[in-house]
Regions:
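Short, cysteine/histidine-rich loop/knuckle motifs that typically chelate Zn2+
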Residues: 60
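Axial heme c-ligation environment in periplasmic c-type cytochrome domains
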Residues: 69-76, 94-123
Length: 135
């Protein structure tokens, strides 16, 4: 009987983790981006432009493979939807006020607010494409 309960508990915990991941991938965030269509292949030209923007604007707080002032960017598309990522780039203040994941991240990273870089939608999309390249 104890063995059966242990197995049920293990399965239950596993399902909760999958549910949390699924919830974070379905969350589109708060902002202007409601739908992003990604091609099967990474657009290298866009990714290169996104890399330049990332290096100019984001590396004071974000690293690729490890947490810094903000979270690491590698694997971001496994944790967040494309819309959420772009809304966080374009609309960080409203995101940390209204989006539960952004609020959780703000708390986790010692209430360090992400700066609004006043990027265009296209520039945020280029950064997203760079994230696809490094994934």
């Amino acid at each position: 009987m104890k063995k059966v309960l242990f197995i049920l508990l293990f399965i239950s915990i596993g399902c909760q983790n999958n549910s949390k991941i699924s919830d974070s991938l379905s969350n589109k965030g708060v902002g202007p981006i409601t739908n992003v269509i990604l091609e099967d292949k990474v657009n290298i030209s866009m990714a290169n432009s996104g890399e330049k923007l990332f290096n100019q604007l984001c590396t004071s707080c974000h690293m690729i493979n490890e947490d810094y002032i903000g979270p690491a960017m590698s694997g971001i598309l496994d944790r967040r939807s494309p819309e959420w990522i772009m809304n966080m780039i374009l609309n960080p203040i409203q995101m940390v006020e209204e989006d539960p994941i952004a609020i959780e991240l703000l708390e986790k990273y010692n209430f360090e607010y992400m700066y609004n870089q006043n990027l265009l939608d296209e520039e945020a999309r280029e950064i997203l494409e760079f994230f696809r390249l490094i994934d």
